[in-house]
Amino acid sequence: MTSPASAPAASNTWPGLISALINGDDLAVGNTEWAMNTIMAGEATPAQIAGFLVALRAKGETVEELAGLVEAMVQHANPIDISGEKLDIVGTGGDRLNTVNISTMAALVAAGAGAKVVKHGNRAASSASGSADVLEALGVRLDLSIEQVARNAEEAGITFCFAQVFHPSFRHTAVPRRELAVPTAFNFLGPMTNPAHVQASAVGVANARMAPLVAGVLARRGSRGLVFRGDDGLDELTPTGPSTVWEFRNGTVKEQVFTPADLGIRPSTVADLRGGDAAANAAVVREILDGKTGPVRDAVLLNAAAGLVSIDLHAEGSLEQRMRTAFARAAESVDSGKAAEVLAKWTALSQS
């Protein structure tokens, strides 16, 4: 493939962009930003959207191409104003391993440890229970005004930006995505398009090729944090063995390997992390916040620690050293009851 600098500039038309992609040419940021703006405005046909997505996926997305999609999507989002430093802990999904809602539990634990968490998510796509599904099962209302969503963050230390509320223009992609029924670039945009413009993100990406690209886009946008992928295929920091981690800050990305055994965590299996429907996964959330030990707790604390490391990237030390300190903070959040208190307060606020 050729780079935008060496390739002829593709014209901002559907035939121009799709032809360039078929030829193996990388698009410029402005090209994909135009494409997404056109889609978000409802001015692209399902055939044009599908052709663009398939051609882009077949060529292989670049950081610049994803950055253009993200920029346009953020421009079309409903804005929300939440004060201070904010953190998102989120996975792209798509690992098809049907685990419990690890990132949702990790978000509660990180909030209990003092982080202001603004989680951006949706209903399940490839599993039985997405973050929105399990939060509803826990009693957190999602049919809130934007002002109420912001209030939850300010008063409870955590909130949830429901993707379909904050990105209504994304509805124009529904038909071609459903009919294609294969992953495309759009499956990876959620963690990069938090409408609260969070400063820090801990992002699990199951797709090994896409993970460093997500880190690259977030770095390009001035964010900081960690992108990770378990060697077992999980879109989480996994307790089953090593994970590859891409640490991004100050516009740069550094790849490294994290091994949970270095923190004294006993190896487990993906089967130990399997979940069920929203009601079953909500019961697991309550068990973990009540202090139940085992592989699920290990996974939750690891991912909460990743979030705490992400928002505190100025701290000194190796990734292992910083994870060790953050893991202890996450454990204290659960064992002191602070994480459970966060959920109780959030639920009550959302119902008031």
From Swiss-Prot:
GO terms for molecular function: anthranilate phosphoribosyltransferase activity; magnesium ion binding. Keywords: Amino-acid biosynthesis, Aromatic amino acid biosynthesis, Glycosyltransferase, Magnesium, Metal-binding, Transferase, Tryptophan biosynthesis. The keyword Mitochondrion does not apply. Belongs to the anthranilate phosphoribosyltransferase family. It catalyses: N-(5-phospho-beta-D-ribosyl)anthranilate + diphosphate = 5-phospho-alpha-D-ribose 1-diphosphate + anthranilate. NCBIfam families: trpD. This is Anthranilate phosphoribosyltransferase. Its EC number is 2.4.2.18. Binds 2 magnesium ions per monomer. Anthranilate 2 binds at residue 177. Pfam families: Glycos_trans_3N (PF02885), Glycos_transf_3 (PF00591). It comes from Paenarthrobacter aurescens (strain TC1). Pathway: Amino-acid biosynthesis; L-tryptophan biosynthesis; L-tryptophan from chorismate: step 2/5.
